[in-house]
Amino acid sequence: MEYAGERKLKENMGTPHPSEVVKITDSVYFLNYFGTSNATLLIGDTSCILVDAFESDGYAEAAKQEIAKITDKPVKTIVLTHQHPDHIGGGAVFADTVDRVIAHTSAAVTYGRMELLKDIVTVRNLHQFGAKLTAEEALSSGLGAVVPPNGQLRPMAVTEWIDAPKAELTIDGVDLVLIAAAGETDDQQFVYLPKENVACCGDDYYASWPNLYAIRGSQYRDVSVWVDSLDKLIALNAAVVLPGHGDALIGAERVQEVIKPYRDGINYVLEETLKGINKGMTPDELVNAIHLPVELADVPQLQEYYGTIEWSIRGIYSGYFGWYDGNPTHLGTMNVKDKAEKTIRMMGGTGNILREIADAVAKEDMQWAAELCDILLNAQVEADVAKAYKKQALEYLGRMTTSANGRHYYLSVAKEL
């Protein structure tokens, strides 16, 4: 059987890339595919600046060896585009020479008592990233091929915080403009080199539909602000954009033809969702109604290899309006087990449901099969059979989706059943 999502994901985001150093100018080098994340080397008068610090000490060590082939000037400054672990994890490899680590403050306050969620955060992170899957099962990160672990997470502490919409710095002869650009994270900043007309954009752009909502769970990512940040990137008219994941965008025309439709696609989904909410549409109605227009639907960088449009719509609804969908029936809910038992009786008993599940599986109607399995599991009847069928359904759904995050979550939970 061919799984369409799996095939598309493998063809577009499943091919391993060797690490490479791309010379952008005489003083700017793009350190690409050292692990999942990229970094950029800026050569100053007597020292170097590193924009981002890789995902682990192992990948940072490999990059450090390549840096030594380019220059004998030490890395003395690290500038972080944001503080996701995969962009800070190798910082300590440069600790013997680095004396400044610069980052932007967060544009939003982190919710309190997050430590009470540490267990479920761990579980859902493992599911989203497919940590317990084989490389073949995981297939892709959604931003490129799965890469093997290489060392440990060893970040350096931030020594200097930027708390302004824009900060102009000169570090050892290198002019930098740090531009607040909240998006995938609230502490995101662009690192712009005005003399070279080069922009490091962190994770506000990568060549996939972005994680406007992360299924591992997170605070709301302000999609409106993300669009505004992409407007800032477009307005720079940079000749080169260096993303935190994937290949460099080289040439001013190339930059515009990639970033503009990326921005337009995200903005379209945001505004159509808000218009639908204003009409009283529920999240389920919105995800069935909203699709990218034809001029954006086939844009390569808007394909759903990482996030998905459906998750984005649901995230926007929740972020703006919370959990309540406006239907007063949902102001109160039945006990899950009681509801499942009543549903089973209404459907003529467990035998009828099992036959319907088997029929759905035979017809490859796996979403329906999984939902029927949940009725039995919630009622705590025929649990072993229901789990076996649900495992089969989740494996199918995981292999049919193009989203690596979705694939990982489906297949991880299936393995646990």
Report the location of each language-model feature.
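A short catalytic or substrate-binding loop motif that flags glycine-/basic-rich loops and adjacent residues
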Residues: 23, 32-35, 160-163, 170-171, ...
